[in-house]
């Protein structure tokens, strides 16, 4: 894991990443940006659910031009979830599936 400077990422970068996810669809988005589906949390935006780590990693790429690997940063409560909540986004724990 590397030390990522999240201060360059704004709500606009995150919104742009969400738009990219909607435009490409999950499969192509993950293939293009190097992430996978979420396992524990969802970013909730306009009543839709998104993978927080993938969205934040892509937002970082939009903000800095630097691509992050999934292994470069944490996605949980002390990682992507915390950064997105600090930017004012809603994060929800995924519902348990049986």
Language-model features: locations:
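Intrinsically disordered, charged low-complexity linkers and terminal tails
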Residues: 1-98
């Amino acid at each position: 894991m590397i030390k990522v400077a999240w201060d360059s990422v704004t709500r606009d970068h995150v919104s742009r990443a969400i738009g990219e996810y909607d435009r490409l669809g999950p499969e192509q988005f993950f293939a293009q940006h190097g992430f996978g589906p979420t396992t524990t949390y969802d970013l909730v935006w306009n009543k839709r659910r998104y993978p927080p780590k993938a969205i934040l990693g892509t937002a970082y790429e939009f903000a800095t031009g630097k691509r992050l690997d999934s292994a470069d940063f944490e996605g949980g409560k002390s990682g992507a979830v915390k950064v997105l909540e600090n930017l004012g986004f809603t994060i929800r724990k995924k519902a348990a599936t049986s």
